[in-house]
């Protein structure tokens, strides 16, 4: 019999520690000016075609064999279970003439593959997800069917949160502003935005966001996913065409489907394929009538969180102008984290924001808040305020969240604590480049561009993914592992999320343990063609040499293939 109390996630009270220690746990102090890097604008220069490293054939073969063995064992377990343990498989069996909730085929991956490693996903945490994060300890005695919680926690170095600029803090100017807003406005504004839910704080924060991204106006949403999922149907219909990058986020896909627009996809970041597709669609027109499309909109992301790659914005703007299309850029992961002043991909490439028709972003990641925004010309935003369902029926962004957004924006621009925003931007730029180049030199395969704060490191075999996650947790390091269907079947990976809250010494500690675990799991399979090689040989640098030389080398673009 399962005890309810043993499976309930416990409520852990805040730690009673000195204030200075608390601040240090949430945001590490800079130990040297050498550990800063000023990101540079590319002045309209396009990205080169990426050079992707690939493992030897035997690595791919072993990965496929891993899946084959798991699938065979899973089917054997299903046969034995459905034959001898029917009471444990009621959800996939017919009961009293009712069809099963799930078929054995559609639920196979979840039951027989994912459940084996469920302890690596959705780990509950408590407290502020800053430089360190408190993970609730849990155990399972029945292959992750359920977990029990002993009531203890582990303080782990945080490489798992989208806390890019380190604004996830319980002390400081942002927290003070949020508390003051709560005292003045409360936690709820009383109704949807078009009824009585708009306060002066909403208007002011939308103005700040628009000014920050370089647009005339902006509209805020209380949920990032809902921003994309709800706004496409305001200006698209079945006579419009959306040309979408194949790796666009599911929120974009959901929104486009709800709009009823036709959709065509092009290979990720392949500008030749995109241009060919645009030309074909202009010639062919609508599928049945072959009349010209009412409008064609190209949808891309600024920074792709599973790949660490960036949209080739200069080429996209060139194609948009050449073929008279609209351009939509989702800056969920790039706004605040990329560019010399943190203004995203336009800032990174040195391209005027006026060249982007519609800009979307989330406020959860770089700003430590919640929700999303759409920024565009004022007449477009005015139309969205009338047409979208969210302002009429959805809940507005709470006042404390608005205060967090406004104060973090003011910190980045220097209106509050001049110099602090630039330090945060320079710290995340250095940390991202240092960790990426160090991993390459150690012999790991990593994807993405040099300045990306998201660093995917390939693990390949499904058995190595939970092993890596568990071994890092034992070393008090919290990481996120990702597998199919979020990635290709044989390209499971760990995704390191770099933060300005981390110190150089934190990354040294991380590298030492990654190096140790990588040797034990045989993860060093890089050929060196994507970077990190030494004297033309596959990179297998000594960890001491990496820590000694890489902090200086990572500031030199010649060490990166960009």
UniProtKB/Swiss-Prot annotation:
Q: In which pathway does it act?
A: Lipid metabolism; sphingolipid metabolism
**GO cellular component entries:** membrane; serine palmitoyltransferase complex
Question: Record's Gene3D superfamilies?
Answer: Aspartate Aminotransferase, domain 1 (3.90.1150.10), Type I PLP-dependent aspartate aminotransferase-like (Major domain) (3.40.640.10)
Put simply, this protein is called Serine palmitoyltransferase 2
Q: Which UniProt keywords apply?
A: Acyltransferase, Lipid metabolism, Membrane, Pyridoxal phosphate, Sphingolipid metabolism, Transferase, Transmembrane, Transmembrane helix
UniProt EC number? 2.3.1.50
Instruction: Give the bilayer topology.
Output: Single-pass membrane protein
Catalytic activity entry: L-serine + hexadecanoyl-CoA + H(+) = 3-oxosphinganine + CO2 + CoA
Gene name in the database record: LCB2
Task: Name its cellular compartments.
Answer: Membrane
Principal subcellular localisation of the protein: membrane
GO-annotated molecular function: pyridoxal phosphate binding; serine C-palmitoyltransferase activity
Q: Where, by residue number, does the polypeptide cross the bilayer?
A: 61-81
N6-(pyridoxal phosphate)lysine: residues carrying this PTM: 365
Q: Which CDD domains did the record assign? A: KBL_like
- Similarity annotation: Belongs to the class-II pyridoxal-phosphate-dependent aminotransferase family.
Origin organism of this chain?
A: Kluyveromyces lactis (strain ATCC 8585 / CBS 2359 / DSM 70799 / NBRC 1267 / NRRL Y-1140 / WM37)
Q: Which cofactors does it use? A: pyridoxal 5'-phosphate
An individual GO BP term: ceramide biosynthetic process
Question: Main EC class of this protein?
Answer: transferase
InterPro entries associated with the record: Aminotrans_II_pyridoxalP_BS, Aminotransferase_I/II_large, AON_synthase_class-II, PyrdxlP-dep_Trfase, PyrdxlP-dep_Trfase_major, PyrdxlP-dep_Trfase_small
Known Pfam families for this protein?
A: Aminotran_1_2 (PF00155)
Does the record bear Plastid in its keywords? no
């Amino acid at each position: 019999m399962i005890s309810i109390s043993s499976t309930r996630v416990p409520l852990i009270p805040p730690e009673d520690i000195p204030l200075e220690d608390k601040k240090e746990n949430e945001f590490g102090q800079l130990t040297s000016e050498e550990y800063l890097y000023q990101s540079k604008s590319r002045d309209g220069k396009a990205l080169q075609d990426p050079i992707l490293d690939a493992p030897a054939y035997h690595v791919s073969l072993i990965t496929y064999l891993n899946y084959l063995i798991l699938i065979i064992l899973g089917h054997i377990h299903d046969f034995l279970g459905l034959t001898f343990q029917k009471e444990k498989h009621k959800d996939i069996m017919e009961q009293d003439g009712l069809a099963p909730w799930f078929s054995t085929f559609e639920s196979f991956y979840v039951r027989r593959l994912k459940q084996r490693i469920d302890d690596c996903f959705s780990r509950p945490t408590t407290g502020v997800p800053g430089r360190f994060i408190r993970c609730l300890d849990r155990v399972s005695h029945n292959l992750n069917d359920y977990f029990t919680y002993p009531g203890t926690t582990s303080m782990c170095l945080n490489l798992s949160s989208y806390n890019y600029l380190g604004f996830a803090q319980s002390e400081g100017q942002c927290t003070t502003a949020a508390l003051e807003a709560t005292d003045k406005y409360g936690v709820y504004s009383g109704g949807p935005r078009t009824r009585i839910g708009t306060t002066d704080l909403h208007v002011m924060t939308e103005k700040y966001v628009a000014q920050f991204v370089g647009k005339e106006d902006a509209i805020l949403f209380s949920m990032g996913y809902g921003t994309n999922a709800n706004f496409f149907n305001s200006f698209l219909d079945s006579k419009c065409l959306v040309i979408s990058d194949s790796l666009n986020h599911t929120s974009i896909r959901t929104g486009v489907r709800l709009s009823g627009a036709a959709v065509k996809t092009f290979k990720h970041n392949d500008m030749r394929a995109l241009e060919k597709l645009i030309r074909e669609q202009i010639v062919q027109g609508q599928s049945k009538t072959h009349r010209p499309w009412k409008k064609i909109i190209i949808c891309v992301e600024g920074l792709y969180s599973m790949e660490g790659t960036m949209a080739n914005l200069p080429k996209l703007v060139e194609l948009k102008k050449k073929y008279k299309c609209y351009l939509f850029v989702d800056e969920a992961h790039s706004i605040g984290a990329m560019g010399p002043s943190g203004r995203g991909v336009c800032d990174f490439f040195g391209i005027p924001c006026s060249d982007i028709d519609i800009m979307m972003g989330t406020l959860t990641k770089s700003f430590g808040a919640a929700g999303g925004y759409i920024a565009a010309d004022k007449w477009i935003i005015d139309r969205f305020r009338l047409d979208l369902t969210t302002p009429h029926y959805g809940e507005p962004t709470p006042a404390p969240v608005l205060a967090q957004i406004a104060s973090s924006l003011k910190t980045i621009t220097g209106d509050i604590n001049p110099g602090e925003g630039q330090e945060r931007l320079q710290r995340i730029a250095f940390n991202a480049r240092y960790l990426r180049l160090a991993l390459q030199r150690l012999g790991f395969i990593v994807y993405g561009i040099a300045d990306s704060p998201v660093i995917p490191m390939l693990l390949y075999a499904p058995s190595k993914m939970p092993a890596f996650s568990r071994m890092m947790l034992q070393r008090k390091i919290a990481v996120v592992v990702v597998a199919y269907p979020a990635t290709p079947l044989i390209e499971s990976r760990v995704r390191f999320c770099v933060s300005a809250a981390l110190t150089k010494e934190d990354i040294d500690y991380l590298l030492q343990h990654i190096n140790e675990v990588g040797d034990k799991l045989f993860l060093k399979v890089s050929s060196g063609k994507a970077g990190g090689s030494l004297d033309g040989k596959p990179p297998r640098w000594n960890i001491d040499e990496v820590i000694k030389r890489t902090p200086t080398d990572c500031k030199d673009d010649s060490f990166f293939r960009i």
